[in-house]
Amino acid sequence: MRINPTTSGSGVSTLEKKNPGRVVQIIGPVLDVAFPPGKMPNIYNALVVQGRDSVGQPINVACEVQQLLGNNRVRAIAMSATEGLTRGMEVIDTGAPISVPVGGATLGRIFNVLGEPVDNLGPVDTSTTSPIHRSAPAFIQLDTKLSIFETGIEVVDLLAPYRRGGKIGLFGGAGVGKTVLIMELINNIAKAHGGVSVFGGVGERTREGNDLYMEMKESGVINEENIAESKVALVYGQMNEPPGARMRVGLTALTMAEYFRDVNEQDVLLFIDNIFRFVQAGSEVSALLGRMPSAVGYQPTLSTEMGSLQERITSTKEGSITSIQAVYVPADDLTDPAPATTFAHLDATTVLSRGLAAKGIYPAVDPLDSTSTMLQPRIVGEEHYETAQRVKQTLQRYKELQDIIAILGLDELSEEDRLLVARARKIERFLSQPFFVAEVFTGSPGKYVGLAETIRGFQLILSGELDGLPEQAFYLVGNIDEATAKAMNLEMESNLKK
């Protein structure tokens, strides 16, 4: 699908005086606006309220039309705070949906829902913009070939591989390495696939958004010296913003990603943190618009809203958008309508484990809880599938034996089980990997491990060829040859100490 970009400015900041209306009612972030007969705006059109507040400060509030009420009135939802607005203020219909800048000019910059830069680094080139509301690619444009999206991260590629153009749910609490994993994926897609990334911060903490930006600058994902060489564009609509902004910021990020896919023909990574906040914002807007709530108080249009976002995230014949979405599960209830609706769209889940993080095994991806629809022999091949299954079986058996080991000790196990435990511990450590973006913290150079190398390494451990090597040799290394070399170094060091 090709975009037909407009050449107007981003958001709704530059306007002609066309089709003016008047504010007739304000209820929080919801505005009712009256227009002259025969000049009603379309649904999703951007409106701008312009004027001055009681102390003479200029007001410029963007809204989006949600309902046509009759009697020449529309109901719109504000994208920014409505403090200072009064009845009778002039409202301008822009005649089009919210449009945001797209293309290379967005890389290394932070935007709000309207596509306006919020990082104090000056204006952005707005010669090419695109509306945030678009239809999903037509069937004929889709790339239906099932292919693996190689990340260079062993535990992901082997046990829960990502689909090119697929959607992945990322589950993890605070402090288990979610941000570092996200940054490594951004780094690897740029190096291995020549792709770029778009990060959509939907309804999360402003502090976390700031921390992510600072860490990206520190790790080189955002290049301060030459912004154009950055690998990511950031779009934030944080939890202090009105529900309208939080509901639409995901679409703004997606629109930027679509341009890289359709026009630049690149592989794009789209991060959404957090997809639950998108649903939550939609629920707030639905209540403000007076719709009858559905199950558990959610909006009746929940599935439609989720589908309209998720169906645009796909592979076309030009390129792909692979989406990684952090999923918050309210009260750990997986049957809650918000996560349940999200699960229907996911191709893989990556679960981060606090237990593994406590052991110092990073990335702390749980190899048994993480799943993928791609892990089938006809897609990944027999060799990959068999290796992954044997790794999972070994780790599952080790998990079952841990209670016995804790009570009776390793000596009480059979010879066969002792061997299995030793191999499982090697596998657990070999699933750790030094990251490029964590070099500044760990001092270990980052490693990108190809899928073939990953499979070969785990096959050697499972076959017993490396039973004689110490388990610490497998910790934080790249491929299996590095583990062998590390074992030799450890042996030499221990001999020198003697």
From Swiss-Prot:
Query: What reaction does this enzyme carry out catalytically?
Result: ATP + H2O + 4 H(+)(in) = ADP + phosphate + 5 H(+)(out)
Q: What's the protein called, per UniProt?
A: ATP synthase subunit beta, chloroplastic
Q: How does it assemble?
A: F-type ATPases have 2 components, CF(1) - the catalytic core - and CF(0) - the membrane proton channel. CF(1) has five subunits: alpha(3), beta(3), gamma(1), delta(1), epsilon(1). CF(0) has four main subunits: a(1), b(1), b'(1) and c(9-12).
Domain of life assignment: Eukaryota
Q: Which UniProt keywords apply?
A: ATP synthesis, ATP-binding, CF(1), Chloroplast, Hydrogen ion transport, Ion transport, Membrane, Nucleotide-binding, Plastid, Thylakoid, Translocase, Transport
The EC category is translocase
The protein's job, in short, is: Produces ATP from ADP in the presence of a proton gradient across the membrane. The catalytic sites are hosted primarily by the beta subunits.
Its topology with respect to the membrane? Peripheral membrane protein
Compartments reported by the entry: Plastid, Chloroplast thylakoid membrane
Q: Which HAMAP family match?
A: ATP_synth_beta_bact (MF_01347)
Could you read off the lineage of the organism from its UniProt record? Eukaryota, Viridiplantae, Streptophyta, Embryophyta, Tracheophyta
